[in-house]
Each structure stands twice: as C-alpha cells, then as structure tokens.
Amino acid sequence: MTNIRKTHPLMKIINDAFIDLPSPSNISSWWNFGSLLGLCLIMQILTGLFLAMHYTPDTSTAFSSVAHICRDVNYGWFIRYLHANGASMFFICLYAHIGRGLYYGSYMFQETWNIGVLLLLTVMATAFVGYVLPWGQMSFWGATVITNLLSAIPYIGTTLVEWIWGGFSVDKATLTRFFAFHFILPFMITALAAVHLLFLHETGSNNPTGIPSNMDMIPFHPYYTIKDILGALLLILTLLALTLFTPDLLGDPDNYTPANPLSTPAHIKPEWYFLFAYAILRSIPNKLGGVLALLLSILILIFIPMLQTSKQRSMMFRPFSQLLFWTLVADLLTLTWIGGQPVEHPYIIVGQLASILYFLLILVLMPTVSLIENKLLKW
C-alpha cells in the first residue's frame, strides 16, 4: 500500500514542500531565516487576532483600548508586547534573510527574488499602518509625516494625501482604514509567501558555494526540520527575553502619550527597522528628491540581479566583494543610528555621506570589484 502522505492531494503538497523536498546537503544556518519568517508571520497573525478582539479603531477610544488590553485582559500585556516585539524579530529575520540572499547570490532566482522584494514592501506597509493603531503621539505624528511625503508627487500629490487620510488631516477615517489595512495585509503576505515558496521549489535552494547541488541532495525531513526547530527555539527564546525583561526597549516613550494634533514631539522618528530609509529620506534637502531616494533605497533590490557582473554566483570565494558587502552592512547600521538622531551637525553630513556610500556600493563599487575579481581568476 502506498503511503497516504504521497497519494492524498493535500498531503502530497505538504510532503513535496516540507518532507521529501530534495535539499542541498551543505546549507548553513543562514538558510534558517525563511522558516523563522514563517514562524514570525504565524505568531503575528495569532497575537494580532487576539488583540483585534479587544481593540477599538476609533480616535476617542483607541489609546484607552490598548491600555485596557494591558491592564484588564488576561495576559493582554503579554499578547500586546509579543506582537510589538514580534514585529522587531520579524524585521531582524527579514534583513538577515535578504543579506543572505545578497551574499550567496540567491537573487539569481529572479522570480523568487522579485516576489521577495514585493513581500518586503508589503511587510513594511503592514508595520507602518500597525504602528499608527495605538494612537499615541508617535503613532499620530509618524502617520502625518510619512503620508505627507506623497504630497511631493507633482500635480496629484495633495489630492492623493487627502484621499488616503479620508479628510484634511490624520483623523478617525485614517485610523479606521489603517486598522482595516493592518488586518488584511498579513493574509496577503501569507499568500505571497506561498507563491515565494512555489517559485523557490521550481529551482530548488541555492547553497553557500553557489555551485549547482543536484548531485548531492538530502531530504528536508529530518535533516532540516530538526535544524529549523533549533532556529525556532532560539528565536522564541530571544523574543521571550525581550518581551518579559525589556518590553519597551525598542519602542518610543512618546507613544505612551495619547495623540495630540496640537503638540508636536521634539523628534519624530519611525520604529528602528525603518530608520535607515528615514535617514536616506532626510539626507536630501529637496522633498521630492528625498521621497525618490527613500523609494529607491528599497526598490534597488529589484536591480541587484541585473548588476551581477561576477562569474561566480556566491561571495564565498570572493574576498574583495566580501569586504564591500560588510561595508554595506556597516553603512546600513550607520544609517540606522543617524535616523534616530536629531537633524543637526555632525549628524546631517554623516547621514549624507552614508546615503551616498549606500548607493555607490550597490550601483558602482560591487559590480566593478566583481569585474576585477573575474580578471584575477585568470592569473
């Protein structure tokens, strides 16, 4: 008798994706982040669902409904902080996942990569609208500042902003629609993740060497299921430590003050995971130029496969490219730091230099160094 796992239409899909999937025998822990992102998504949807049961998307009651969740709902504080810090863990895994893709040349699977960029944009949109929901000072002013960026679009900008707001300022209509977006987007992310996986399984996984591994494959289960479980345990441990010991470490104290349109906070800044893009936005004195740079800082990922000039896929055997890659990581950390600082000397010039270096590294230096490495191969 044939195993039901291999014959049943539904079980067969699960089997081919998570059990009998042929996987390269040498993939490292950097390949764990895909499954960790799946885990983060499930956790965020579940905690978010329980929060939505008690939250009210109305300007007069939103802030107090969050306070009510934390004070009166059984383990409400725990669910709320799991959700808030879960978002941070989500972005840590996301950036590590993208970094792995850049380092090992996974972007050469173009369909998978492009769906991944789309996923990144959707997750960023979800996190942004979610940050507005507690209706604290930073929620309100963050929403005002970021949505206002669209007014830089010539001719239709102002109309577009008022259309998104549902009025002439960020108000009740804005909060209600942002809650609706925040509820629906994670399900779109889930669907996109399934498509991401579908395209990945068309080609099979890449591996650290960047060399085809068709001749040396092992089944996903038990080898990589056990490895993913270890990663999951470490992720949960980190998340629990963050949530139970320092739940407000990554948050903004201003968000414990109810939203007040008449009082602007001294320093308006987004959550830490958007600071690098915020720093790039602020480093350009022109509004439209800043918005374009902000967009390009993320959308540049789409062009990465076209900028591949190396004969080798992975950076594993390319020391000069490795140096530039880690310079890029350091540059992004610098931008993240600058994004959280006030707009004054010396932060302005450091931010501008880091922004220039970011685009220079990706568009000019990395492709050029790859060509030089190709020449060195002939020596």
UniProtKB/Swiss-Prot annotation:
<dbReference type="GO" id="GO:0008121">
    <property type="term" value="F:ubiquinol-cytochrome-c reductase activity"/>
</dbReference>
<dbReference type="GO" id="GO:0006122">
    <property type="term" value="P:mitochondrial electron transport, ubiquinol to cytochrome c"/>
</dbReference>
<feature type="binding site" description="axial binding residue">
    <location>
        <position position="83"/>
    </location>
    <ligand>
        <name>heme b b562</name>
    </ligand>
</feature>
<keyword id="KW-0472">Membrane</keyword>
<dbReference type="InterPro" id="IPR036150">
    <property type="entry name" value="Cyt_b/b6_C_sf"/>
</dbReference>
<dbReference type="InterPro" id="IPR027387">
    <property type="entry name" value="Cytb/b6-like_sf"/>
</dbReference>
<keyword id="KW-0349">Heme</keyword>
<feature type="binding site">
    <location>
        <position position="201"/>
    </location>
    <ligand>
        <name>a ubiquinone</name>
    </ligand>
</feature>
<keyword id="KW-0812">Transmembrane</keyword>
<feature type="transmembrane region" description="Helical">
    <location>
        <begin position="33"/>
        <end position="53"/>
    </location>
</feature>
<keyword id="KW-0249">Electron transport</keyword>
<keyword id="KW-0496">Mitochondrion</keyword>
<dbReference type="InterPro" id="IPR005798">
    <property type="entry name" value="Cyt_b/b6_C"/>
</dbReference>
<dbReference type="InterPro" id="IPR030689">
    <property type="entry name" value="Cytochrome_b"/>
</dbReference>
<comment type="subunit">
    <text>The cytochrome bc1 complex contains 11 subunits: 3 respiratory subunits (MT-CYB, CYC1 and UQCRFS1), 2 core proteins (UQCRC1 and UQCRC2) and 6 low-molecular weight proteins (UQCRH/QCR6, UQCRB/QCR7, UQCRQ/QCR8, UQCR10/QCR9, UQCR11/QCR10 and a cleavage product of UQCRFS1). This cytochrome bc1 complex then forms a dimer.</text>
</comment>
<feature type="transmembrane region" description="Helical">
    <location>
        <begin position="77"/>
        <end position="98"/>
    </location>
</feature>
<comment type="similarity">
    <text>Belongs to the cytochrome b family.</text>
</comment>
<dbReference type="InterPro" id="IPR005797">
    <property type="entry name" value="Cyt_b/b6_N"/>
</dbReference>
<keyword id="KW-0830">Ubiquinone</keyword>
<dbReference type="GO" id="GO:0005743">
    <property type="term" value="C:mitochondrial inner membrane"/>
</dbReference>
<feature type="transmembrane region" description="Helical">
    <location>
        <begin position="113"/>
        <end position="133"/>
    </location>
</feature>
<feature type="transmembrane region" description="Helical">
    <location>
        <begin position="347"/>
        <end position="367"/>
    </location>
</feature>
<keyword id="KW-0679">Respiratory chain</keyword>
<feature type="transmembrane region" description="Helical">
    <location>
        <begin position="288"/>
        <end position="308"/>
    </location>
</feature>
<keyword id="KW-0479">Metal-binding</keyword>
<comment type="function">
    <text>Component of the ubiquinol-cytochrome c reductase complex (complex III or cytochrome b-c1 complex) that is part of the mitochondrial respiratory chain. The b-c1 complex mediates electron transfer from ubiquinol to cytochrome c. Contributes to the generation of a proton gradient across the mitochondrial membrane that is then used for ATP synthesis.</text>
</comment>
<dbReference type="InterPro" id="IPR016174">
    <property type="entry name" value="Di-haem_cyt_TM"/>
</dbReference>
<dbReference type="GO" id="GO:0045275">
    <property type="term" value="C:respiratory chain complex III"/>
</dbReference>
<keyword id="KW-0408">Iron</keyword>
<keyword id="KW-1133">Transmembrane helix</keyword>
<feature type="transmembrane region" description="Helical">
    <location>
        <begin position="320"/>
        <end position="340"/>
    </location>
</feature>
<feature type="transmembrane region" description="Helical">
    <location>
        <begin position="226"/>
        <end position="246"/>
    </location>
</feature>
<dbReference type="GO" id="GO:0046872">
    <property type="term" value="F:metal ion binding"/>
</dbReference>
<feature type="transmembrane region" description="Helical">
    <location>
        <begin position="178"/>
        <end position="198"/>
    </location>
</feature>
<dbReference type="InterPro" id="IPR048259">
    <property type="entry name" value="Cytochrome_b_N_euk/bac"/>
</dbReference>
<protein>
    <recommendedName>
        <fullName>Cytochrome b</fullName>
    </recommendedName>
</protein>
<feature type="binding site" description="axial binding residue">
    <location>
        <position position="196"/>
    </location>
    <ligand>
        <name>heme b b566</name>
    </ligand>
</feature>
<feature type="binding site" description="axial binding residue">
    <location>
        <position position="182"/>
    </location>
    <ligand>
        <name>heme b b562</name>
    </ligand>
</feature>
<dbReference type="Pfam" id="PF00032">
    <property type="entry name" value="Cytochrom_B_C"/>
</dbReference>
<keyword id="KW-0813">Transport</keyword>
<feature type="binding site" description="axial binding residue">
    <location>
        <position position="97"/>
    </location>
    <ligand>
        <name>heme b b566</name>
    </ligand>
</feature>
<keyword id="KW-0999">Mitochondrion inner membrane</keyword>
